[in-house]
Amino acid sequence: MHEVSLMEQTLAIAIAQAEDHGASQIHRLTLRVGQQSGVVADALRFAFEVVRQNTMAAEARLEIEEIPVTCRCQHCHENFQPEDWIYRCPHCDQISQTVMDGKQLELASLELS
């Protein structure tokens, strides 16, 4: 379960940001997790419950925004969200190899005090 190490790193970044802004407590973390990131949101939530203990995020809420895969067709230049793992453009029926969104794992925002 690599989500534990990912959450440890994410929480370390959040704590560093909180300290840089003079905060003593993290109330909320918002993550953007791409559908194709290889990260399981429920495992990330479980990892957060474990790694936040005895930190300034001990009482924090974790919000996860799941980001769908968005492709861009090289043929007709339209963006689309594929319906399966074959990225066929619904506009021109060609296969796309360009994923524009949906692979990320980002710390999108923090609520601090």
UniProtKB/Swiss-Prot annotation:
GO biological process, alphabetically ordered: protein maturation; protein modification process
Keywords, comma-separated and alphabetical: Metal-binding, Nickel, Zinc
Entry keyword annotation includes Zinc: yes
Matches recorded under Gene3D superfamilies: 3.30.2320.80
Residues the entry annotates as binding Zn(2+): C73, C76, C89, C92
Keyword Metal-binding: yes
Any one GO MF annotation of this record: nickel cation binding
Disulfide bonds, paired cysteine numbers: none
Phenotype reported upon loss of the gene: Disruption of the gene abolishes hydrogenase activity but does not affect urease activity. The hydrogenase activity of the mutant can be increased by the addition of nickel.
Residue ranges the record marks as coiled coil: none
Any Pfam family the entry gives: HypA
Chain residues that bind Ni(2+): H2
Family: Belongs to the HypA/HybF family.
Function according to Swiss-Prot or TrEMBL: Involved in the maturation of [NiFe] hydrogenases. Required for nickel insertion into the metal center of the hydrogenase.
HAMAP family associated with the record: HypA_HybF
NCBIfam families: hypA (TIGR00100)
Stated name of the protein: Hydrogenase maturation factor HypA
Provenance organism: Synechocystis sp. (strain ATCC 27184 / PCC 6803 / Kazusa)
